[in-house]
Structure formats: C-alpha cells, structure tokens
Design a protein with these regions (language model features):
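A composition/biophysics-driven feature that prefers long, compositionally simple stretches
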Residues: 1-141
Length: 141
C-alpha cells in the first residue's frame, strides 16, 4: 500500500460524509482514480468491469473485481479478504450475461436494493448498458 490504513479510513469517512450530505446511501464507484483513492487498488484491468462499493455506514468499502484481478486487490488494498468480491470470468463478453448480474445479486444479498444509489455517470468505463442493468436489476433503488 502506498498510504497507511488510517489514511484510507480517513478518505472513506470523507466520502461517506459527502454521501450523507447528498442523500446517497450506497455509492458504486467505477472510476479507477476513485477506486485507488478509496482502497489502493490500481490494477491495469480497468477495461473490464470493476468497482468499489461504499455503504454510507460501512467500516470498509467492497472491491468488486474479476477473478483474474483478485490477487492484485489482495496485495494492493487494505481491505479484509471478505470485502474483496470476485465475479467469475464467465460474465465477461458472454452476452446476455454481464458482470453487473453478480453485482446486482450482491446488492440484493446485502439488502441494499432499496437504498438511494449513487453512480459516476462520467466514468470512462461505466457505460449506458451498465446503467441500464442497474436500473432494471434494482428497480426500487
């Protein structure tokens, strides 16, 4: 890690404070810079679906990555192993499956599907298709 665990915790608290001020209960961050800022994750696999999920009251964010990139997340982040969420490679380029399918299931499993969710609409790899998958998969969010 380039920074201390305490530094990352302070960054998380700042983001959560901003989320509270904006009424956001769950943040899905796909921007690689923001993912790195929050966790230290810096893999050069940004062209595949990956994100950091921040619950407004969580002690740690979740890092959602493909199986092949999990090793980098274990090494480069301060996160506990259980907060690195791995999706299977079968979701990559196998339409109609998409990596947001297990992301949506993760959100439902944690009972977050009715929360006010914030996303980065100007993030380079957060496509209109990703946005539509979230809207369709989480209609009550």
């Amino acid at each position: 890690m380039l920074f201390s665990k305490e530094e990352y915790k302070n960054r998380l608290k700042k983001v959560q404070k901003s989320m509270q001020e904006k009424g956001i209960e769950l943040l899905i961050s796909q921007d690689t810079n923001n993912m790195n800022y929050l966790t230290g994750y810096d893999a050069w696999s940004f062209y595949y679906t990956q994100c950091v999920i921040v619950h407004v009251n969580a002690e740690e964010p979740l890092c959602f990555v493909r199986a092949q990139d999990a090793g980098g997340a274990y090494i480069k982040t301060y996160l506990k192993r259980e907060n690195i969420i791995i999706y299977e490679e079968k979701y990559i380029h196998t339409w109609p499956m998409h990596p947001y399918d297990p992301l949506i299931e993760l959100i439902k499993k944690n009972k977050w599907e009715k929360l006010n969710i914030g996303v980065e609409m100007d993030s380079h790899y957060f496509t209109a298709y990703c946005y539509e998958k979230l809207k369709q998969g989480l209609p009550n969010a």
